Amino acid sequence: MLISPSALPTAEQVAITAAGLQTWGYVVKQSPNVLKNPRTIQDRYDDLIGGLHDTSVKALFCVRGGFASADVMDLLSIDTLRQYPKWLIGYSDITACHAAWHVAGIPSIHSSMSAIWDDLEQPCVEATQRLLAGDKPDYHFAPHPQNICGKVQGTLIGGNMSVLTGAFFSHFDPSLFDPNERFILLAEDIGMTANDLHRFLTMADHIGLLKRVNGIIFGELTDFIMCPEDLSGSSHGGSFVDGQDIAARLLECKGYHIPVAFNCPIGHGKQNYPLLLGETVYLDITPTDVHLYY
């Protein structure tokens, strides 16, 4: 079923998504309020609940992200999710929904949405089609000069850092699920400032999330904004070069000496390789390769 628990999609986005899924062999339903304008938080919640309760629906495909899916998650009972487990597909603001799915113990798919069929490079399109058909990803990504090598495994969680920050301390905070669980953290964003990145890593440290992270996959930091007047790096040992430099040095100064892969093709660019959240993933980082597999 097509839903949009975040921002209101256009009719074109809904049509493109429906047609694309149909060409892949799926029967597509459209939730009643997906194009309702204006609509309310309750309308978005009703679409989500309707999809969960509909026994003919096997997956909830989010048409777009945007803002405020957390409002819907605030209304959603984790017990309801557990009672009606369904696949969830989306990314960006849908990270709040992924967090709730994880707390409920249900895997979900971090993937592009309507952009799959009009704004994504073909290898990513094909990878998404394979994952929806049941093939688990096995990727080799290019190395980055600031990568920290190592081989680790853990349950993959995360997504958009700004949205994930908003989930901290909520009933859908992914760190609430199974205190003994170890994670691989996925982290990407668009339009993020250096201060935002510092805030995310600091809060993830304070709530104890980073202490349970075995490794980090940083996706693209699209349109990243340096803040030289506030966070120049002069108080952290010298000027920061970019977002990757900020993250690497903050993790080091906080005592997290774990494998980290930077600038993986996941996020808001033309490349957004899909991933399966809530499942054990293996991360093998060497000087020449980043191998991510299940």
Give short role names for the model-derived ranges.
Residues 179-243:
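Internal helical hairpin/lid segments
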Residues 107-172:
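Conserved anion/nucleotide-ligand pocket segment
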